[in-house]
Each structure stands twice: as structure tokens, then as C-alpha cells.
């Protein structure tokens, strides 16, 4: 049982690492589309690419954010005394809250994604992509990175 609890304490670090890495991947890969040297081609192809690509990568979001929430909550309820004694409880709570805060950007993100998919502004969709990239980077720095750091602190304290 102790081994399972130790694993449970570490799992939010793993799942939030995946989320943070995905955000970084998005920034690096999607950022290619706004480079001046390919802007003309990007404006022609980005809406179709994004629409089809979104169907392929959305599973990462559908799986890993709820996993973060579930693991954060499970950690708060299993062996609570140990978490209180070590001070890890507040770090799991903060990690969970930062992870949930990612969703505060949901409507903004969906609006920008719709603009990309609908080629808005017409013929200059890279403008919308640039706005999405800025929002995504801000969101990663303000929610995903702190969640990851909090889950690391929690695991270090709990173990």
C-alpha cells in the first residue's frame, strides 16, 4: 500500500509534465506558421491544417487535464494526515488550482481557434495564429508551469 501511495504522490508530476510539454510543443511547432518567410503559404494552408490537426491532438487535452484534476483531488483525500504533517497538502491544492485555472482561458482560446479555422481575418489568418500563440504562452506560464512546480514541491514534501 505504501508503494501505491508513493506512486500516487508522483503521478501529478508526470501528468502535469505532459501538459506543460504539450504547451511548449504547441508554441514551438505552431509558431512556425507565423514566420515571415512562409506567411503567404501559411495564410493559404493554416485553416485546413488547424481544423484537421485539432482532431488529432485534442485527445491530449481531453485526457491530461482531467487526469491532473483527478490525481490532485485523490492526493488531497488519501492519507490526509501525512500530507498535513509534511506540508504537502497546500502544494497539491495549489497545483490543482493552477491546473484548473488553465480552463479560465477556454472561451478566449476557442474564439481564437474559430478565427483560425474560419480564415479570419480573411487572407491573414496568421494574425489570429499569432494572437492564439501569445494567449497560449501566457496561459502556459501562468497556469501550467506553476501547476507543475507546485506538484513537484508537493511530491518532494510528501515523499
UniProtKB/Swiss-Prot annotation:
The keyword Nucleotide-binding does not apply. The chain crosses the membrane at residues 59-79, 96-116, 139-159. It is found in: Membrane. Glycans are attached at residues 124, 136. It comes from the Eukaryota. Its main location: membrane. One of its GO terms (molecular function) is oxidoreductase activity. Pathway: Mycotoxin biosynthesis. Keywords: Glycoprotein, Membrane, Oxidoreductase, Signal, Transmembrane, Transmembrane helix, Virulence. It is a multi-pass membrane protein. GO terms for cellular component: membrane. Residues 1-25 form the signal peptide. It is an enzyme of class 1 (oxidoreductase). Its EC number is 1.14.-.-. Belongs to the epoxidase xenD family. Probable epoxidase; part of the gene scp cluster that mediates the biosynthesis of a hirsutellone-like compound that has still to be identified. This is Probable epoxidase scpX. It comes from Mollisia scopiformis (Conifer needle endophyte fungus). The lineage of its organism: Eukaryota, Fungi, Dikarya, Ascomycota, Pezizomycotina. The gene is scpX.
